[in-house]
């Protein structure tokens, strides 16, 4: 599936110096804004996108402005003053804070399961920012259809990845994202999509920690273009891991998957792990 998320406010990646008209450099947001901050409002005007932030900065010009930010779990106000700085190849002057920001994310992952009520779990890990490593706080998100166009094989030192495209058509939306956690994303599927896939899926019992055992198991993936079951060997378990994403250690011994991908590649995250007819985990 394709995953698209919109952040809660504007996410700060970092700050950097900007060049003023006289050729000197200033860094207005230094020691004020930090990677991982979320800008929620400017002078008490809500900010939901990069465009909102840009417009409000331009309106404020070089007057000190109050930013309402979320830092960790604490909401605070900070003050920062924009500067008139050069931008682009033509050195056009704009009011700037000298910050790098983002307001959305997109990627491809695998849905692990859904229940009779259409509640699903996917991805097997949280959606984090690639620059800061921070788990993103999402205001809302959506699942879309995705097509796999190719596979970059994994090799030592390079995990490889599935290469694909997400269809953002309204008719391609499969559901919504309600929670982004460190062990996966969770949400609700559309009724239309549930009706479309209900006869194509096999129900499994839910497994518990005490059901795990070393030895053979399977993962389910459509990495080949159609859904397949691939053999793996469960090697060891950590029932109280410091990282909740690393409780199961297994290796792939299915030659079909090894020849296709070289093992587990990015984009296969969330593939269900099946042992003795139960879903016992996710890649």
Residue locations for each model-derived region?
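Short, flexible surface segments
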Residues: 8, 35-36, 213, 269, ...
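Conserved PDZ fold ligand-binding element
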Residues: 28-50, 274-276, 280-281
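PDZ-domain C-terminal substructure recognizer with occasional recognition of PDZ-binding tails
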Residues: 54-97
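PDZ/PDZ-like domain micro-motif
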Residues: 17-37, 269
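Short, Lys/Arg- and Gly-enriched loop/turn segments at beta-strand edges
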Residues: 45-56, 77, 228-231
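Serine endopeptidase catalytic core focused on the charge-relay Asp
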Residues: 83-84, 90-262, 266, 275-276
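Generic structural signal for well-ordered beta-strand positions
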Residues: 76-77, 121, 280-281
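N-terminal, Lys/Arg-enriched amphipathic/low-complexity engagement segments
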Residues: 1-13
């Amino acid at each position: 599936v394709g995953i698209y998320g919109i952040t809660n406010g504007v996410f700060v990646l970092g700050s950097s110096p900007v060049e003023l008209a006289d050729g000197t450099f200033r860094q207005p947001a230094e020691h004020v804004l930090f990677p991982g901050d979320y800008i929620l409002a400017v002078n008490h005007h809500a900010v939901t996108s990069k465009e909102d932030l840009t417009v409000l900065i331009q309106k404020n010009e070089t007057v000190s402005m109050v930013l309402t930010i979320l830092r960790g779990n604490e909401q605070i106000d900070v003050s920062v003053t924009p500067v008139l700085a050069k931008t682009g190849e033509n050195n056009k002057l704009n009011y700037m804070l000298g910050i790098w920001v983002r307001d959305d994310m997109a990627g491809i992952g695998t849905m692990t399961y859904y229940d009779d009520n259409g509640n699903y779990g996917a991805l097997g890990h949280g959606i984090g920012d690639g620059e800061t490593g921070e788990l993103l706080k999402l205001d809302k998100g959506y699942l879309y259809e995705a097509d796999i166009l190719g596979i970059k094989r994994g090799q030592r030192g390079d995990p490889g990845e599935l290469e694909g495209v997400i269809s953002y058509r309204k008719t391609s939306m499969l559901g919504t994202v309600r929670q982004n956690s460190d062990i996966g994303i969770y949400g609700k599927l559309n009724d239309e999509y549930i009706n479309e896939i209900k006869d194509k899926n096999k129900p499994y019992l839910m497994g518990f920690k005490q059901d795990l055992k070393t030895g053979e198991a399977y993962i389910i993936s459509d990495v080949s273009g159609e859904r397949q079951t691939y053999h793996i060997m469960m090697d060891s378990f950590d029932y109280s891991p410091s990282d909740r994403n690393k409780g199961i250690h297994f290796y792939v011994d299915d030659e079909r998957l090894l020849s296709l991908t070289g093992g587990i590649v990015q984009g296969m995250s969330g593939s269900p792990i099946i042992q003795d007819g139960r879903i016992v985990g996710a890649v």
